[in-house]
């Protein structure tokens, strides 16, 4: 707070085993206002598919009751074998009924360097399931605030992707500045070494041209499902139509 203006709070990503009353108190006392918990699923069969150990969720719920934050988001994965809307509804309601006021539901992403011992859901089924999730959340009155995220009451958000600028701390964290994008090292020991030597843990820095910064802005603004021409002009000092008139025309012709 001595060096930067914090406009949208301080968020921390947590593993379920880290959600204890003691640790939450430490985070809150340090100024953290938002937390995101990587639940993935409350159901043991899907945790096994993901190689995750079973967690005592009641301990998590109890800790969240005792130590409250402005935003408590829980992350889930959909499009796993055998998953249906009914199984996902169970996860969604359990989250919102036990301390979460925001959820993120991401499709399973198969990274090439990870082991997977099950068959992926087809893109057609995945898309159908996403539409079912969106319809269900709309009927329940939950507010969709980005492609994969929903707020219980519409006033809680947790995402760096939809912020114009942000600072990231920790392994693999990213930082977005006015014309730079920085990625921290993924290696824990290298991260610790750099910090102990009073060096930045950055492993990659991208210097944006003005055009690249605009593209980045538009890509992640679209992620929030709404591109506002007034916001674009306020941020860049130029109109969206002037900078991307041709692209917008093509998009309209394609019905986008």
Predicted regions span which residues?
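Alpha-helix C-caps/helix-loop-beta hinges
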Residues: 140, 253-254
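Short, acidic/polar N-cap/turn motifs at the starts of alpha helices
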Residues: 156-157, 254-256
């Amino acid at each position: 707070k001595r060096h930067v203006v914090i406009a949208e709070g301080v968020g921390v990503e947590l593993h379920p085993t880290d959600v204890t009353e003691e640790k939450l108190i430490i985070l809150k006392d340090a100024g953290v206002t938002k937390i995101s918990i990587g639940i993935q699923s409350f159901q043991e069969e899907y945790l096994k598919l993901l190689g995750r150990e079973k967690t005592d969720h009641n301990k998590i719920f109890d800790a969240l009751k005792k130590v409250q934050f402005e935003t408590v988001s829980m992350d889930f994965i959909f499009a796993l074998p055998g998953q249906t809307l009914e199984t996902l509804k169970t996860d969604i309601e359990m989250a919102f009924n036990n301390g979460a006021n925001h959820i993120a539901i991401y499709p399973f992403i198969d990274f090439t360097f990870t082991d997977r011992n099950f068959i992926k859901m087809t893109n057609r089924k995945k898309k159908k399931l996403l539409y079912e999730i969106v319809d269900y959340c709309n009927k329940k009155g939950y507010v969709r605030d980005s492609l994969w995220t929903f707020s219980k009451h519409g006033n809680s958000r947790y995402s760096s992707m939809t912020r114009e600028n942000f600072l990231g701390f920790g392994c693999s964290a990213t930082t977005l500045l006015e014309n730079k994008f920085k990625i921290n090292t993924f290696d824990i020991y290298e991260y610790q070494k750099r910090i102990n030597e009073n060096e930045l843990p950055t492993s990659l820095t991208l210097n944006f041209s003005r055009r690249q910064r605009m593209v980045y802005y538009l890509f992640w603004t679209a992620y929030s499902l709404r591109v506002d021409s007034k916001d674009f002009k306020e941020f860049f000092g130029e109109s969206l139509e002037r900078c991307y008139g041709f692209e917008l025309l093509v998009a309209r012709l394609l019905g986008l």
